[in-house]
Each structure stands twice: as C-alpha cells, then as structure tokens.
Amino acid sequence: MSRSTALCGAVALPCALLALPDNVLAQTANRALPPVTVDAPRTAEIRRPAKRTASRQTAARRPTQSTSTPAATTPQPQATAAAALSSIHQSPTGQPQTTVGRERFDNRPAFSVGDILRESPGISVKQGNGPRDLGISIRGSNARNGFGIRNMVIFEDGFPVTQPDGLSRSDLIDPHAYGAVDVIRGPSSALFGNYATGGAINFRTRPASEINGIEYGIDGGSFGYLNNYLTAGKKIGNFEASLFASDVRGDGYISNGWFNTQTVNFLSTLHVTPDDRFTVKFINNNLETRLPIRLSLNQFHQNPFQEGCVTGATAALGCGRVTLNNNGFNTTAGTDSETAEQAGLGRKDRRTIVGARWEHDFSNQSTWRNQFVFDDRNISQPTGSTSAIGDFPSYNYMSDFVGRGEMLGMSATTYLGAFYNTMSWSSDTVQVKPGGNATLGRLSSNVRGEHTNFGLRAREELQINNAWTAVAGVGLEQTQLKGLNTAYTYTGPTGITTTRLTSAERDFQNIAPELALLYRPNGEWLFRSRVGTGYGTPQVGNLFVVSSGQNGNNTQLEAQTNVGYDVGFDWTPNNTTKLSVTGFYEFFRNELVTQATPVGAPNSSFTFNAPRSEHRGVEAALDWRFHPGWRFTVAYTYLDQIYTNYAEDIANGAVFRFDRAGNKIPGISPNELTARLGYDEMFGPLKGLGGFVEVQWKDSFYMDNANLLKAPGYELVNLNVHYKTDLASDYLKSLSVFFEVRNVFDKTYVASANNIGNTVTAAGLQNGAGILANTTGSIYAGSPRTFTAGLKLAFR
C-alpha cells in the first residue's frame, strides 16, 4: 500500500493504614473537575435533611459536560442524594481523577478514544486489533495485554460496558458521541469491584438539552477515512432523549487494514413522578475490518506499513506471514505461508448493550437506584492461523442507596450497594486454511465457560469540618469460574480425531478496603492522601493456554491483588491556573502478566502470575490560561514498574530458570507526555477562529522479561486550525469546520508492541536482542502523516 496518504500532601494517613496487609485493600473517590483538570476536587458540605422540593428532578440528572474554565475555588454543593449517587461514577471523593471536556476534542478529528484520553495524566494507549480497538491503560494497568481493555472498569452514563470477565473493547466508542469523559485513577475495587486494579473510566454522552436539535457532521482525510455522523436531542417536559449514529470507513494505513463500522448510541430519561426517574440506554456497534499481521522489531524496521505484501510467494522483504495447513487440520498435505491479505485475516463483530435504570427519591437526602444491563458480544475473528468464533451474552444487576445526613455531629454521605453479574458462553477456535477470505478448516478447540461475580460494597464520607474530609469504604466479592476446554488433534491424511479435555472450577473471595483523607487549608490548596486496593481474577480462557500458545493446563493461575498509596495536591491560585500532582506507590501480588505467543499458535497470548511486583510513579497536569484566548495544557506520567519476586522457567529440551527480580516489567513506557498550546479568538470579526500545536512523547520500553530488547519511543507533532460561528437562520444554529495535520514530520513509530517471550539455547543461555528482534506477533506501526478536515452543522 502506498504511504500517501503528592506529593506534598500535608495529610499523611494514620500509620495504621500503612500497616494494612497487601491482599486486603482497595480504593476510593473524588469529585468532578473541569475539562483537563486532575485529582481530587473540593468536597462539598452536606446539607441537613430538608423538606423535599421539586429540585430533586434536575439535581439528579447527570451533570453536563465540563466547561473550559479551571476549577472553581469553592465547589458547588450537591443539592440531593441523587446527585451524589450520580457522581459515584464521575468523581468519587478522595481519588485522583480527571475530567476531559468536549471542548478538548470537539474541534479536531476525534477518530478513536485515544484522541480523548491522552489529555489525562496516568493514561496510555496502544493500538489493538482493529481501527478503534485500543489498549487503554491507567498507570500501565493494561500495557501487558495484547488486545482489548483489562484491569479497569468502564462505564457509559453510569451503565457498565465491561463484561463480567473483565473485558472491554473500544470498538463501540465514537468520540463524537460524548460530552465528557471521567478518568478515575488507582486501585478501585472497593467501589467498582473485580478488575478495577487500575481504576475506572466513565463516558458521558451529551445531554439532550444541550443538543436541542439535530447536528450533522462529516470528517474525511488520508487513507480513505470518512466518518458521517448524526446527533439529535430534545427535552420536552419530563422527558428527554438523545441519539447518536455514525458510519465510519477507511482503507487503513497498513496493507490489509480497511475497516467499516457503524455505531448507534441512545439515551432517554423519563421523570414519571417527582420522585421516580426511568432511564434507558442502548448501544449497538457493527464492525467489519481486515487485520494486518503483527511484526517483529526487524520486520517493523524493514517494512512497517506492509507494502508489497499481497501474497506469500511474491511478498516483499519484511512482510508478515502466517503458516496455514493446506487441508485445514494438519501438516500431512503440506502448509502454505501466506500474508494477511492473501489469507483474508480480520474481524467481523457485533456488540449490543441494553440497559435500564430506575431511581427513586425517598427524600432530598436519600435515593435508591436499581440498574440492569444486558450485554452481548458476538465475534468472528480470523486473526492468524485460527479464528475465534463465539457469542458472549452477559447480565449485570446492581442496586444501591445513598443517604445524606449527620454522624457524630458531622455531615455524612452513606453509600451501600449490592451487585450480581454473570456470563455464560461457548466459543470455538477453528483453523484457517488457504483459499482467501479466512476460509475455515476444522475445529481446533472449544471452550464452554461461566463467569459470575456477586458482592456488597459500603462507603462513608465524613466532612469533619470545613478543612478536613475523611472517606472509608469496603467491597466484598465472590467470583466463580467454570470452564471446559476441548482440544482437537487430527492425525494422518484423513484426520483421525482425538480430543483432550481440560476442566477448571475456581472460586475466589476478595475484600477491598479503602481510606482517604483530604485537607483544604484555603481556597488555593487541596492536599490528598489515600490508600486503596484492587483485585482481578483470571479469565476462564487464561486457564487453558500454555506458554507455547497451545491449548493446555494453566489452571493454577491466581487472582492478582494490589495495594496503592497516593499522596497529592491541587493548586489553584486563580481562575486561570491549575496544577495537580499525584505520587503513587502500588504493591502487587500475583500480578497477571500476558505475553505474545509465536505467530501460528492456536492462541495469540499466554498469561502467568508474577508473585510480587511494584508500581510507582508520578502524574501531573497543568492547565494555564496565561492570556485571554491562550491556553497551555500538559498531561505527564512517569512510571517505574519492576518485578520484586519472579522466576521464569524457559524450556529448550531441558527447563532453565531465570530470576527476574529487579527487572522492569515489559510494555511499560517510563515517560509519556501530551502538551498543547492553543489560541482561540474571543472577540471581533474573527471570533471562533482558533488553532493549536500539540506534542506527544512516549519513551522507549522493554518488550521482554529479561530486559534485552526495547521498542523505540517517539515524538509526534500535530497542527490544528478550526472555526465555529453562530448562524442567523430559522433552521441553522451554527457551523463548525477544522483542518488538522497529524504526525507533521512523518515519523515512523511503534503504535503497539505486545510483550514477547524470551528464548534460550540448548545450553541454557538466553538469546540476545538480535535473536529476539526476529520474534513476530508483536508490533503494529503508527500512522504516517495524515491530513483530515471536518464540517459540522447544527440545526434548530
């Protein structure tokens, strides 16, 4: 294909908190901040119970998008318990948190979730298996996984879009649909349960009252990219509804990378009575895409965009290949080495989510909420020598209560909740054979599984006085895994079938407490300290894959747990400046680490436990409006993650053991930064005209447990110019246009590098970087220079 186209928290937690055992801790919360602000905002004084008023209806609504102004010196109190309940998924008190408002991505080509989340410190993203499939990490939580999103919990308008097994996919996220995104950082299982070891993210669609009409937009640019999208919203009396729909297509910048995806996102709320609200949520995403093969580091340097890779026989240097059995079940009829385009590798998936929520106000000071979500993920994914095929329906129910009042003479907010979620499925792994369009051969394996989580959580927020606020919470959860793996082997030219059964039935019990203390001496400073815990159980599929990528017994996997300590501050000297800094230190036990398996293996990744590891780092964010119209923002993350107890066994005839204690955990970039300098004309005939220059920096990182091979880092520069104006028309409200150049200097860089396994010689010596650089199945290149323009019309 052508390339045309904390640190000073004056509030140390009591020593007793620091002595809590590693395997018994969790996390807590904060409060919603404006656009690109970070960490715990100020706590609001809780009002004494008052006579009920009709204001409950509006206060209970989800907050609108964050504005572009810095944090106010005095927070607005939450008028009702319903508002406090809504804030649980947006800004839980005491927890490092960032809200990215729509004004940060409304005037640029927001193609994927990465275009939003890079504005938050602590966040890193890498390309997954599809155009909008990104691996999102909070403090490096997901950097060791090869696809999808794990080790955090994701919500949309408060509805969970993470399935019970902990998997989330960003394919269904079109940034144009959202008004704000809340990033909650640090171990959070006390509040969000299983898999919230890194934190949580809540996407908020635009309120219907803000849309108040119809908007149509179109983005287009390099490599055949075209996004047509429509937004509609209206509030009439006690009812409001919003609808978003988009059709996105493109050729992709890597050979065999074309895509075609449609998304529908609907939200409606009906105030049946002054005390009762019913909300309905619907999301549907259809994805059809081709997928290139992940490369070795050497192949990346030779041919990053897979040019000249039509067939294996005529492939250019550096083309990725996959070996397919000619008969579709074994090697007796020979094999064929094919490129991704020749084999027809790709994905054809559907995701459907339906949710319903009922909220009832007993008074202004107490609200009860019940919520149910049906989430169905249907996949057909020939991504290599095999294709994963299956349907994964899940059910999620939660019921919670918030009450506001007094405790020991102090204003208090009490939160209690119970939850149950489950998923039951049968999925096949089928061999791909020559013939194009991912022709299927015989069944390689089948997994039948059940994954169930249920538990309780409680939380108390106490405003000790005007300066001090304390938070305590705990979550208790039971997780049940049941699975049966049937692996098929075929011998001889006729394929005589033998089967091997591996079963697993595991129960996990987890307790996750959290404690936080906030101190605000005056309107400029807020100091925070917190100890939180997280846990994440293995997935059923992890239990049946061994290090070679073959089907086998890996049922000894344990749940990972982490204990995290945060200390930080927010400094807001005036309305134009906000600086937030958080330092953290997290201790992991049995961390679940994933690495890529060789290309051609039935399974693309293998998961193991690292007995002990430590994660530490610093998150910083600056939002500085140094002159009218000008704005400078920075989001920076420093990460240092090491194994402290892990011995790796590597086989080559005999088995050799290597001590990895002290080594860096692979996949973790130590430094990441996004900085933007922008100007928007606020007055005069050019009002609405603006632009910005943006710099993204990602440091190099290790790809293997022995720390022998590094993926190179990169620096990218993006330029944007945009214009928005109101229209004097009976039918049109406004016109918005933009033009953006990304990767201005056309850097070739690594957008994704999955961890690779180390190898040894027959004598037990580890192979060096020169050998490891030939290990395939790891790297996707990032996009070269692109040009994108967009136009949006808002109708009355």
Annotate each language-model stretch with its function:
Residues 589, 686, 696-702, 724-796:
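C-terminal beta-signal and adjacent terminal beta-strands/loops
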Residues 410-422, 448-587:
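Structural signature of Gram-negative outer-membrane beta-barrels, strongest in the C-terminal barrel
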Residues 361, 367-373, 379, 520, ...:
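Membrane-embedded beta-barrel scaffold of Gram-negative outer-membrane proteins
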Residues 220-249, 254-303, 309-313, 346-361, ...:
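Transmembrane beta-barrel wall of Gram-negative outer-membrane proteins
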Residues 75-98, 114-159:
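Extracytoplasmic beta-strand/coil segments of soluble accessory domains associated
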Residues 401, 478, 578-580, 584-588, ...:
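Gram-negative outer-membrane beta-barrel transporters
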Residues 113-116, 135-139, 152-156, 169-171, ...:
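N-terminal periplasmic accessory domains that precede
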Residues 159-185, 308:
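Short acidic/polar hinge/loop motifs at secondary-structure boundaries
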